[in-house]
Amino acid sequence: MSLLSVIVPCYNEEQTVADFYHELVKNDAFFRENEIDMELLYIDDGSRDNTVEEVKKLRELDERVHLVSFSRNFGKEAAMYAGLKKSHGDYVVIMDVDLQDPPSLLPQMFGYLKEGYDSVATRRVSRKGEPPVRSFFARLFYRLMKKISKTEIMDGARDYRLMTRQMVDAILAMEEYNRFTKGIFGWVGFQTKWIEYENVERVKGETKWNFWKLFIYSLDGIAAFSTVPLMIASLMGVLFCLFAFIFIIFIIVRKILFGDPVAGWPSLVCIISLASGVQLFCLGIVGQYLAKTYMEVKKRPIYLVKEEI
């Protein structure tokens, strides 16, 4: 009898916790036929609503349901990491509680594992129902990552992924504080099968990911899996030094040959302002990487557990 660990991060999801459970257990017949036992791990990321109480109600009905509740909101990345740490399964799957990750795909995903794959991942082939601006910047992010990172991150990739214990242990070996799981999946390697499906809208409630949070998350991903921004900052510094050197030679030659006085305060102010802006931009890039390093060396725990059942 093999064990499947289902990891479900939750943040203020009282409306969807029960719906997810009832949709997931529709696979029970498949699990029995294939001698698969299940543990369902709800990872509460410091919810302020009745998410914890809803999970406890499910626990009274089904002992396969477990709860790990954080002391505060640490973020989805911390919740996924905690779920992987707490899991005991021979196979582990990460799913969103809002049912945008269809549990009905699990039998198909297990079929691919039997073919010898270490991981079965999912990606959306459309973004129907999303705001156009959000979809545009999401595609832009994936195209950018493809160009500047050596780690492959598929366009439209979801966190919904079924993995073997060997792959999970490899991910857990990466104990970095600043986590970008989509990149970590690609970095550890292993043979992966991709399943594509149309975008599924939330069953209830509203997304907790606004544009600003997604923007910060994308910056974390770039800083975690690419050093190209640092190279760009260095290149811009070299180019401006070269420009300044050429401009100095131009002024000297103009003075010697034509005797023109050095003038043009407006243009000089514009050049200084532009150079200062570029310097601050490059300093911001360096600061982003320095901040990540600072958080790593402090070695604070990725999450703190308040309650566990």
Tell me the role of every PLM-derived stretch.
Residues 44-52, 99-100:
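A conserved acidic beta->alpha catalytic loop
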Residues 32-46, 68-69:
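Short beta-strand/loop segment that forms part of the nucleotide-sugar
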Residues 143, 180-309:
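Hydrophobic helical membrane-anchoring modules
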Residues 57, 64, 68-72, 76-86, ...:
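Acceptor/aglycone-binding surface of glycosyltransferases and processive sugar-polymer synthases
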Residues 13-16, 47, 102:
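Donor nucleotide-sugar binding loop of glycosyltransferases
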Residues 13-30:
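Short, well-formed alpha-helical segments that are part of the catalytic scaffolds
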Residues 3-5, 39:
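Cell-envelope/extracellular polymer assembly enzymes that use nucleotide-activated donors
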